[in-house]
Structures are given as structure tokens and as C-alpha cells.
């Protein structure tokens, strides 16, 4: 009887370890893909100080808390805009007024400026590059979905 309990305990621990490593691989993939997105934006706009500043901030954030980007992406991009993202209308995001989305944030003005820093270069891209940017967003949403679904186990 006791050996059966130990077996279940070991199996549970093993599943938790597997889940942890699986989630960390999703986080790593998300962060790498996000940086690819930023780097591709820098190819299109190599002298854009806002993108360079954003990249530096993202690198710092990833070092302090690697999973924060994917969690925030899920909560503030994927969840509220999933249907719009799947429709593929990038102009919606470029032209949207985000003031209501960040009104409850401690420093909403800062976040509105950050959104503008990110979307302004996209607004000025050729259509082909806008479509690539949208594909990055779709991929990041898919990864954040995977991370969130695995949050509670297999």
C-alpha cells in the first residue's frame, strides 16, 4: 500500500518537473521570437532610437524575470485582442486609442507612450513588412496561449 503512494508521489513530482521545463521552453521561445521581432524592426528602421531603447529595456526585463513578458502579453494583448489579431487587421492596432486599456495602470501615460513607440514604426512600414509584423504578433499570441494552458498542468 505504501509503495503505491510513493509511486504516485514520484509520478506527480515527475509531471511537475516536466511541466516546469516545458513551460520554460515556451518562455525561452517566446522571448527569442519577441527579440527577433524587435531585431527585424531594427532592420527596417536601423536608426530608430525608440526601438533601440525598447530592445534594451526588453533585454533587462528578460534578465530580471524571464516569464513576465509572456504573462503580460497574454493578459494585455492576447486576451483582449485575440479575435482582432486572428482577423489579421493590423490597421486596427495601429489606429486604436489605447487610453481605456491602460487607464487602471499606475502610470498610464508611460504605457501609452510605450505603445506609441512600438506602433509608430509599424505604421510607417510597407504593407509586406506590416504583414510580417502581424505574423510575429500571431506567433507570440500562440506561444502565450500555450504557456497559459500549461499553467495548470498536463
Question: Model segments located where?
Answer:
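N-terminal amphipathic/basic-hydrophobic helices that include classical n-h-c signal peptides
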Residues: 1-23
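Short, hydrophobic/amphipathic alpha-helical patches that form generic packing surfaces
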Residues: 135-146
Amino acid at each position: 500500500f505504501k509503495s503505491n503512494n510513493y509511486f504516485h508521489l514520484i509520478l506527480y513530482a515527475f509531471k511537475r518537473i516536466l511541466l516546469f521545463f516545458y513551460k520554460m521552453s515556451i518562455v525561452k521561445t517566446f522571448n527569442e521570437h519577441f527579440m527577433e521581432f524587435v531585431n527585424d524592426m531594427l532592420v527596417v528602421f536601423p536608426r530608430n532610437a525608440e526601438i533601440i531603447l525598447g530592445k534594451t529595456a526588453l533585454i533587462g526585463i528578460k534578465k530580471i524575470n524571464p516569464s513576465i513578458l509572456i504573462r503580460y502579453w497574454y493578459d494585455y494583448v492576447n486576451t483582449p485582442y485575440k479575435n482582432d489579431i486572428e482577423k489579421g487587421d493590423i490597421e486596427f492596432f495601429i489606429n486604436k486609442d489605447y487610453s481605456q486599456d491602460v487607464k487602471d495602470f499606475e502610470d498610464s501615460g508611460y504605457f501609452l507612450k510605450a505603445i506609441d513607440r512600438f506602433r509608430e514604426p509599424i505604421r510607417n512600414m510597407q504593407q509586406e513588412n506590416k504583414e510580417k509584423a502581424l505574423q510575429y504578433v500571431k506567433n507570440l499570441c500562440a506561444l502565450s496561449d500555450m504557456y497559459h494552458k500549461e499553467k495548470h498542468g498536463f
